[in-house]
Structure formats: structure tokens, C-alpha cells
Amino acid sequence: MESREAGIERLYPKITGRMSALYYYLIQLRKQLERVIALYVRNSPHQLVADYGCGNKPYEPLFTPFVEQYIGLDLAYNTKADVVVDPAGIIDMPAESVGFVLSTQVLEHVEDPKAYLKEAHRILEKEGKLILSTHGYWMFHPDPTDFWRWTSTGLKKIVTEAGFEVVYFEGILGRSAMGLQLFQDGLLFKLPKPLRFLLSLILQPLIIFFDKIITAKSRNEDACTFVLVAKKV
């Protein structure tokens, strides 16, 4: 799929589309990022966003209406990166040069999360903010590696120890919904292609239902993905 189209489908998935198996999850992730933008980015004096591990920059359209510049940081193989991260994890940017660091589903793939967060802290301006999402429960998905999963307290701990104050923390898909998501994903690739869509069509509404009946407190403790905002201190 053309990368721009893939990014659009990730932002606005359809239950009948290629990403039907992730339909509800992707919608909730986008809504969380939109909420974070409304709370912390929309009226901020900080006007540069660095997407750290940018991939094909799927969330760029959410941020560009509210900031002056959005740049992608990634390893040299990614032709969409504006700034190269070297193999040692060092970003070719000066200290205190960006207002926001965006990190979406990257931390679990990084061999040294502490070094990754240290570099994010280095390039952030004083009181700049890290906007980060990463997995609590999720299936193994190397891209090209996959090292980590986080508990809610473990994620807060490693971010705080990197020199940040967590000011926002929300979970996406609580225990019951996540269990159904994993059940769906476990069966998905064992089925013939024509039946995969049917499985998603059956299970996605159930995932939505069970996620709606869980409390926010429970979801923020146990979730498939956590979204946080952390201020540099």
C-alpha cells in the first residue's frame, strides 16, 4: 500500500477496510492523540514537533494544523525521515531544540529504552513535552525487533527516571477488550483470507462493548496501550 494511503487508513480505519482487525483500537488511539493535542499542543508556545521513530508519519496530519513545523526522526533507511538517528541512537540535533517529542508505538521496539528517553529529554526545550504511546499487552510484532511490554507503573517509572514529570496518562482497551483482541489476532492468520474479515466483523463490536463497560481506573492500570504526556523537568 502507498505509504500516504496507509497512514490515512491508520488514522481513519474502516470496519470493511484492510485494517478492520484493528478498527476500534486505531480509532481510540487517534482520539487519545486528538485529546492530547487539544490539551497540550493547540495553544502552546512550543511550535516544533519531532516524531521520534517516525515511520511513515501517520499522525502528522493531526499535528500540522497547530504547529509551525513537524519533522520526522528515524534511522537512515527511512526515506521519510528529515533527521537521521545514528545506529548508536544519537539524534543529529542540538540540545533543547524542539517543543514536543512524539513517540507512537516505538519504545517497545527500542533495544535500550533508557537511552532513547534520555535522547528525547536532551532535544526537548525546558518544560517541553514528550507525547508517548506504547504497549501494555500486545502480540509479538518485530519491526525489525520487539523487546518490551509495560505495566502502567513500570512505564511511569522509566519515564520519570529519565527526567520527566508525567502529567497525563490514559489506557486504551482494558482487560476484557484486550483479551478479545488477542483472541481475534491469535485466530486471524490461521484462517483463509476470506474468513479473516468475517472474524473481525464479529469480534470488533464485542471488543467495543466490553471496553465501554470497564472503568477508566481499571483501563488506566491494565491496557493494551498506554498514552502519556510527560513534561521535561
For the regions a language model picked out, list residue spans one by one.
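Short N-terminal micro-motifs specific to bacterial/archaeal maturation
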Residues: S20, Y24, A81, L107, ...
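S-adenosyl-L-methionine-dependent methyltransferase catalytic module, highlighting the catalytic core
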Residues: E111-E119, E125, K129-V233
